[in-house]
Amino acid sequence: MNENLFAPFMIPVMLGIPITTLIIILPSMLFPAPNRLINNRTIAIQQWLTKLTSKQLMNVHSPKGQTWSLMLISLFLFIASTNLLGMLPHSFTPTTQLSMNVGMAIPLWAGTVTTGFRNKTKMSLAHLLPQGTPTFLIPMLVIIETISLFIQPVAWAVRLTANITAGHLLMHLIGETTLALMNINLFSAFITFTILALLTILEFAVALIQAYVFTLLVSLYLHDNT
């Protein structure tokens, strides 16, 4: 196959129009609003996921932080469903786009930082200068800590993008190797196919773990600022 290795990560275009927005909205269709009071299996799964996510992320938060629970749960479900849909063959994974992840991380980071400066002004400013810093190092460390603060959303986005992209690239390479070996040595092809199957299972786990890690980082920064 002569397909470009990075072709799966290119933004899909239909009639000359990028359809990234449509793809991003697609996961919301997996969690439709119930139109009746009687519970069914879909609603039961939604409630279970909501309770589990809330329990894992919100236990350490103060009452002010608890008000962010729905946003954090929605964030986790969105990233997880987007990552899992990207595992389908010939599909596009929006979370492999650094621009999207940065655009998602910056508002969340800005919200937590703004909340911190509004509720804990002195403590937020104190984070810019480690305790016990020598006087002659104060200007330098303040600049370094400020830069570190502004780099945080980029670090979140790069972590998510790199992990999802690396997994998809590795699966693509092993899949191409398996197809090539089928005409050369069936035993070797079977071994690489087994590795591909195990890697696919691992990538499903990574898709969920990365969604959890991204949401957990937002939750931890929120905890420090509320």
UniProtKB/Swiss-Prot annotation:
Keywords: ATP synthesis, CF(0), Hydrogen ion transport, Ion transport, Membrane, Mitochondrion, Mitochondrion inner membrane, Transmembrane, Transmembrane helix, Transport. GO terms for biological process: proton motive force-driven ATP synthesis; proton transmembrane transport. It catalyses: H(+)(in) = H(+)(out). It holds the Pfam family ATP-synt_A. GO terms for molecular function: proton channel activity; proton-transporting ATP synthase activity, rotational mechanism. PANTHER family: ATP SYNTHASE SUBUNIT A. Component of the ATP synthase complex composed at least of ATP5F1A/subunit alpha, ATP5F1B/subunit beta, ATP5MC1/subunit c (homooctomer), MT-ATP6/subunit a, MT-ATP8/subunit 8, ATP5ME/subunit e, ATP5MF/subunit f, ATP5MG/subunit g, ATP5MK/subunit k, ATP5MJ/subunit j, ATP5F1C/subunit gamma, ATP5F1D/subunit delta, ATP5F1E/subunit epsilon, ATP5PF/subunit F6, ATP5PB/subunit b, ATP5PD/subunit d, ATP5PO/subunit OSCP. Belongs to the ATPase A chain family. This is ATP synthase F(0) complex subunit a. The gene is MT-ATP6.
